Every structure is written in structure tokens, then in C-alpha cells.
């Protein structure tokens, strides 16, 4: 089974990203600084050149304007405004959820993939295998595992009915 892979970044390190498998999509997520459009264009061009998908977190309008591959809507984003936007066919809207209520909101937001977290022990929102599996059965959307994935537990996710996984530390450690 081929799993989709998503790498959350908050700074751009082209040398590191270039070393990673081409099937790993990039999600730029930086809530601590103002949006740097020129940096986003640089990342977009890098990703296109290297045949890699690029998603922007939490800004549908800008992702559309920059003609990115899609947008990632975090669990705290409950807005439905983007439903009225003119969205091209191959533009993907993906997003995260921690519970059934958030899954229902993501379905209303018309996302294609739901990132359910946290599958493995993290500081908050820890689900574990049993709760994760139960939540993933509550939707027909494609499921992406998120949270606490590392070299020690990566093989365990193959036991789940998921389309892929997303991580930060797992890909950072491949440096």
C-alpha cells in the first residue's frame, strides 16, 4: 500500500527538502510570523521544479491567488467562506480534526483528506490506535494519520486504514 506523505514546515530549507523522497508533499505552516509572499513563491517554484505538491496552511484566498496545489485548514479553522470561492478542479482542500465534531466541520468545509491527530502520544489531543480507528470510521473522507510519528512507530501505521501520514519530526530526522 502506497501512503501519501505530508511534511509540515515553518521555514524553508531547500537542501533538506531536496534530499527527501519526491512523494512527500510540503505544507507550509507558520503562525508565528506575518506571511511572506515572496518566500511562498520561492517554495512554490522549488516544489514545482522538484515535482512536489505544495499546500499553504490556513489561507485559502492566498493559496488560490498563488496557484498552489491546495490549502490545509487546521482544526481551529471552522470558516465556510471558501465554499463560495471559484476553486479549480485540481486544487485540494485538506484539514485536521481531533474529534467527531471537528470531523463534521471539515466535511462541511468540503475537504478531501482529514488529518486525524494525535495518533501517538503527544502533549495534547492524544487518541491512540483504538480511538483513532473509531474516528476514522466516522467519515467517508480519506484519512491521514498525524501526530507523534517517528522511526520507532512508523511501521504501526501500516495496520491502519489510512491514505497517508503527516509529520514534522519524522522528516526532520531524515536530515
Model regions and ranges:
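Hydrophobic faces of well-ordered beta-strands that scaffold small-molecule active sites
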Residues: 3-9, 24-28, 54-56, 71-73, ...
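Short, polar loop motifs at secondary-structure junctions
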Residues: 9-15, 57-62, 75-80, 97-102, ...
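N-terminal active-site wall of soluble small-molecule enzyme domains
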Residues: 14, 22-86
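Alpha/beta enzyme core
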Residues: 14-24, 102-113
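Conserved, mostly hydrophobic/aromatic
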Residues: 26, 63, 106, 114, ...
